[in-house]
Amino acid sequence: MRVALIGFGVMGQLVAAEVRKAGDEVGAVITSKNGDELEEKLGGHDVAIDFSVGDAVLKNVEACARAKVPLVEGATGWKQYEAQAKQIVNEHSGAMVYGANFSIGVNLFYRIAKQASALFAAVDNYSPFIEEAHHNRKRDAPSGTALKLRDLMSEHLGPDIPTASTRAGHIPGTHRVGFDSEADQILLTHTARSRQGFASGALLAAHWIRGRTGVFEFAEVIDEILKRRSP
């Protein structure tokens, strides 16, 4: 599989290493220096993986859609453009898989948090909350992962779930879901030890999206894998 990488910061470099380790090829690396040539450079690639910046997402989505190259969209801070991005992909009969977090562990954590919310919604006197912490270079707060957790939990607990963010040091990413009462407190925590899991998930999504048309969340990739491997 020939992969075009859009953005070559920390995540882009990790994805490049993961691509090569899997025996695939990095055919092109597109950064802000050559971003104007994106659509042209996409030619001959099987898939593109974008870990650039939120403000560049619409331009990148459109270039991939026009070039008929499936896109794994891993940038953060573009939720306000989500509806427009989906429209662009669908208008060009393109393909895109996106997600607030490409860690397989986080996507399983989503399901645990949602199931826990259903349980606590059935009893009284427990107050839900969400806490997240990341390195001080992360721009968006709350994180996309925290917002996704809140959306999932809100299905059972309503929209008013307090969500707190910390930006400090070199924290790869910690997300905590809590249920607090006068009698006790229950905490569910996901802690990323490195960004390697995000890169592995992005490559998994890249292999999955080939040959498909439409817009998908990474959660759908995980759902399909779970169904395929369930007894």
Where are each of the predicted segments found?
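Hydrophobic beta-strand scaffold residues
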Residues: 26, 71-72, 95-96
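C-terminal substrate-binding/catalytic lobe of Rossmann-fold NAD(P)-dependent oxidoreductases
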Residues: 2, 10-42, 124-231
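Rossmann-like NAD(P)H-binding beta-loop-alpha module
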Residues: 108-123, 141
